[in-house]
Amino acid sequence: MLVLVINSGSSSLKFQVRDVAAGTVLTEGLIEKIGMGNGGDGDGEIVGPRDHAEALEQVEAAIHEELGDLKLGAVGHRVVHGGERFGEPVLIDNEITRAIERLNPLAPLHNPANVLGIRAITRKWPDMPQVAVFDTAFHRTLPEHAWRYAVPDELYTNHGIRRYGFHGTSHEYVARRAAALLDLPVEEFDAVIAHLGNGASITAIQGGHSVDTSMGFTPLEGLVMGTRSGDLDPSILVFLGRAGWTPEDLDSMLNRESGLKGLAGNNDMRSVVEASEDGDAKAAMALAVTSYRLAKYIGGYHVAVGGAKALVFTAGIGENSHQFRALVADRLGALGVEVDAGLNAARSKEPRIISTPQSAIPVLVVPTDEERAIAEATAAVAGSGR
């Protein structure tokens, strides 16, 4: 089956066509500045469309130019928030679309854009099977003691305030790949997976299932990220509010001006590492804060799974920054973690072990592929009609 994978943002639309049976990418692209003028960077230059419907026309033209008359079998959508209802990928109909739309308050930056993509496909190809694959779904297995916040119960019952977790599609895919690399059935796979990109999260895996994760009600909680603060004392927000900061000010500061950017003035890990190596004290401190926070989570999640059988790094920083992996590993001596410097520094796009034979647990680097995971889930759901 040929599957079109759509990742729809408020002003962008990333697409990829995959042959699921062959495991290959046939074409892909990115349309940007939707509703904002001209722009685009895909297989060819694309003029910025007025809206998502026009963007889809350009996607269709780009696909036809590359693939001719090959027919798509289904469309898979990345949907950021599935709330408590959606614990697995689902075939989209009007009721499902409305249900996703009702979750907009939980992900106001993402779900409305996801719905725009769904509606554009529905108008363009009304008979095309569409499947929603949710970032939150993999974390539906969190036990209540992991997803509950210690706040009055009415905040959960009336407002849905709880830990949801994100990056679930990536964490699930990487868990399966890592288990296979270690020749373990996924049902016996207990591990800690660190998805480290501009957005970053860490997940405790027990028996192949998520039992804890660092992102919470929103993707702001947890690790130090590119521009997001991660964990901090909530009273800081009360303090700043009394000092005149508006909710919009606080939201912008925490999501767009904090993290590596707040500490080092730059949200790009490569640049921060280079600056640190050149003697920049702020960059060095940013790396220390970021690696320390991650190491603390790794230690806690080692306990949460009853003793991890592996530590796995994935996503842009996790896959490519051997310097940052080394910084984190250096903080994990109490767990018996030992990384081989040569294996760690070697570049590869393949899943691999980078720890020494003496390491108490294997340390892995496993490239993620969320589009592949979405395509495979879409083919399975569309094929079964569920």
Swiss-Prot record:
Mg(2+) binds at N7, E370. Its EC number is 2.7.2.1. ATP binds at K14, H195, L196, G197, N198, G199, D268, M269, R270, G316, I317, G318, E319, N320. The keyword ATP-binding applies. Pathway: Metabolic intermediate biosynthesis; acetyl-CoA biosynthesis; acetyl-CoA from acetate: step 1/2. Substrate binds at R78. GO terms for molecular function: acetate kinase activity; ATP binding; magnesium ion binding. InterPro entries: Ac/propionate_kinase (IPR004372), Aliphatic_acid_kin_short-chain (IPR000890), Aliphatic_acid_kinase_CS (IPR023865), ATPase_NBD (IPR043129). The active site is at D135. The keyword ATP-binding applies. It catalyses: acetate + ATP = acetyl phosphate + ADP. It is found in: Cytoplasm. One of its GO terms (biological process) is acetate metabolic process. Homodimer. Belongs to the acetokinase family. Catalyzes the formation of acetyl phosphate from acetate and ATP. Can also catalyze the reverse reaction. This is Acetate kinase.
